[in-house]
């Protein structure tokens, strides 16, 4: 059965970027259609990404904390895991959140069309759904088509023992020996989960550190911890993958490469994601898509076709849900007639591992590359009463200041719940705060949060919780 719908705005894709754009359009009084290929809203993030991974990481954290407490006199015994119940818990979290989105769409009178949408012209999209074909004609469009995992031609991806992130999140089994290709955030988060559930985990990364975007001093602290969980093979890459009846055999080359192919029960390919710009027939609407699948936009999220905007993963790095949400708001507001722009000072990044790795603003290597006259100040959690009492004293808080203006331009945290502490640094950068503003703000004690204020005190030379390198020298 074929039907037609007319809308002021159509949003293609209902991930965080897409549903935020659609809901904002509706709130601004625009008749809005939201197209989604899944049966539920939320896209990759809610269904097979950010949210289910955090549910599983919560389980992993509880398991690891229970084991660690034995050293402090609280013995629970060896944790017994029921994979089916863990999976049900993860699915319950997804259902609760996607159901909530569905309810908000109805409340806002957003017309949700389920199926795969492709452009047929500059003002039309055809959606192929289980109930037939729907043609949506529109005045304005917002593309939020997202991204998908990268696949390599020499890997037999059709073998069920070769996983991408979606497969890993299904939690069908816990392999005895797991290889993770890629030392980025997704791979390390999944490695954290499967290690806690009992897998022997190897991680292969072609660069000289995991999470290559983060600064080396932060990753040095992180690596010291995770090396106890994973076998890290840095400066090493996979050259061949062969599926055999008794396992997946992987050949490698580089600094840590085994001499012979290594057998694994499963291999998680987590080497990044590719945008879906080439999968929506954008060219039929006159939209320019580059050879990688990205759609380029201006600061109002407009494509080269003025009434069509694009947001989220499909417009470029970083591929982060929170970036897409803000882009979605801008696109909706521009369509409604507001003169808004996407020009963020900060976009935070977080690896929800244990310990967490989080950074915002400029990294030290970025500041150096840009020729900024900067100074780094750090506060080691080994000097934090709360960190010591909470058994996480191996963390660190790092702040980067402009030496000329004393303004904070970046910051990073490695440690338990580091991502939850990052907000103050992001706000300080966005508001143009200097070191004195942060140092003179009274932070509660004892908290991990106060490490941010103490790092600012290090820069200011007013620190009393550490030896003060900037103290006035006195004659004996």
Outline where the language-model segments fall.
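Glycine-rich dinucleotide-binding loop and its adjacent helix/turn
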Residues: 50, 145-200, 204, 232, ...
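FAD-site-proximal beta/loop scaffold in flavoenzymes
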Residues: 158-175, 261-335
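Short hydrophobic core segments
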Residues: 10-12, 117, 136-146, 181, ...
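Short, acidic, Ser/Thr-enriched surface-loop or helix-capping motifs
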Residues: 114, 290, 298-299, 364, ...
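Flexible, glycine-rich terminal cap/loop adjacent to redox cofactors
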Residues: 10-21, 26-38, 44, 51, ...
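Glycine-rich flavin
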Residues: 2-7, 17, 23-174, 207-211, ...
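Glycine-rich Rossmann-fold phosphate-binding loop(s) that bind the pyrophosphate
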Residues: 13-16, 181-184, 313
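Active-site substrate-recognition segment that forms the wall
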Residues: 186-207, 231, 302-309, 315, ...
């Amino acid at each position: 059965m074929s039907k037609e719908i007319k809308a002021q705005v159509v949003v293609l894709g209902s991930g965080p970027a897409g549903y935020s754009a659609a809901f904002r359009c509706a709130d601004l009084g625009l008749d809005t259609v939201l197209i989604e290929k899944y049966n539920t809203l939320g896209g990759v993030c809610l269904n097979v990404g950010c949210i289910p991974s955090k549910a599983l990481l919560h389980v992993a954290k509880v398991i690891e904390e229970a084991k660690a407490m034995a050293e402090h006199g609280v013995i629970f015994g060896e944790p017994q895991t029921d994979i089916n119940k863990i999976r049900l818990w993860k699915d319950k979290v997804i259902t609760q959140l996607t159901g909530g989105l569905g309810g908000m769409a109805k409340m806002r009178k957003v017309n949700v069309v389920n199926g795969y949408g492709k452009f047929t012209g500059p003002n039309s999209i055809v959606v192929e759904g289980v109930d037939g074909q729907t043609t949506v004609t529109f005045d304005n469009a917002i593309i939020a088509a997202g991204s998908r995992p990268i696949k390599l031609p020499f890997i037999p991806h059709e073998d069920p023992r070769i996983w991408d992130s979606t497969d890993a999140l299904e939690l069908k089994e816990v392999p005895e020996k797991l290889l993770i290709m890629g030392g980025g955030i997704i791979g390390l988060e999944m490695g954290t989960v499967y290690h806690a559930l009992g897998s022997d985990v190897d991680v292969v990364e072609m660069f000289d550190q995991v999470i290559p975007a983060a600064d080396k001093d932060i990753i040095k602290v992180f690596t010291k911890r995770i090396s106890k969980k994973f076998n890290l093979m840095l400066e090493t890459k996979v050259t061949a993958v062969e599926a055999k009846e008794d396992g997946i055999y992987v050949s490698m080359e580089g600094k840590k490469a085994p001499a012979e192919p290594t057998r694994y029960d499963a291999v998680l390919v987590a080497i990044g994601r590719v945008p879906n710009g080439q999968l929506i027939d954008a060219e039929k609407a006159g939209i320019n898509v580059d050879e990688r699948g990205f759609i380029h936009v201006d600061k109002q999220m407009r494509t080269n076709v003025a009434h069509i905007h694009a947001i989220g993963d499909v417009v470029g790095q970083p591929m982060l849900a929170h970036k897409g949400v803000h882009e979605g708001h801008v696109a909706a507001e521009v369509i409604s007639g507001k003169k808004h722009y996407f020009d963020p000072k900060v976009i935070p990044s977080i690896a929800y591992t244990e310990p967490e790795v989080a950074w915002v603003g400029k990294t030290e290597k970025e500041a150096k590359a840009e020729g900024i006259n900067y100074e780094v100040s750090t506060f080691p959690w080994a000097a934090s009463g709360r960190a010591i009492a909470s058994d996480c004293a191996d963390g660190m808080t790092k702040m980067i200041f402009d030496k000329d203006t004393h303004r904070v331009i970046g910051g990073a945290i490695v440690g338990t719940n580091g991502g939850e502490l990052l907000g103050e640094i992001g706000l300080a950068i966005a508001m143009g705060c200097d070191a004195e503003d942060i140092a003179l703000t009274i932070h509660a004690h004892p908290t991990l949060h106060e490490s941010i204020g103490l790092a600012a005190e290090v820069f200011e030379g007013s620190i009393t919780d550490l030896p003060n390198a900037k103290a006035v020298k006195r004659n004996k």
